[in-house]
């Protein structure tokens, strides 16, 4: 009914797409977690949470600093908490240009054409960042639907550009790939922008180059 109401609206597809891939909030179980993170440098929780006197302690302030490539934490020592990261928190990691970071989730209850998906890999590769050091701070949530928050200190106005590759696996460890007539359908949310005269800093978030 909702599709029929909007099918002629701009931004909607002309024909309804079946939901063959189930990967939404319903797939999160009590066992869902980040099993491991490889390829990146862990930021100590104490370093991530550090703010200057008088600064806000919100996550966006904590993300908006340049670590200058210095991150000497470990997996467990990088765990941070905030309501935005979900009830199980997340892990603070430093991304460096052209160095992929692999975040592996286990304990999933997802599916594709009734084939159970229990594991997912989210591979992030930084392409550019506006910090002086060229690095980007990230917090990867233990909830794969919340996914990640990123930020750094803006020194030169460059775009934040991150390439994301997602791989899904069944209970036997075999990668799940889309079939020709049953494409994966993506719904993207929390893409924010601040454009116009009411904002001191203009920015827009978008996704491009699917494939």
Task: Provide a role label for each language-model segment.
Residues 182-183:
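Loop/turn elements at helix/coil->beta-strand transitions in domains of secreted/extracellular proteins
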Residues 189:
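Structured beta-strand/turn binding interfaces of compact recognition modules in eukaryotic regulators
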Residues 4-177, 192-211:
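N-terminal/edge-of-domain interface segments
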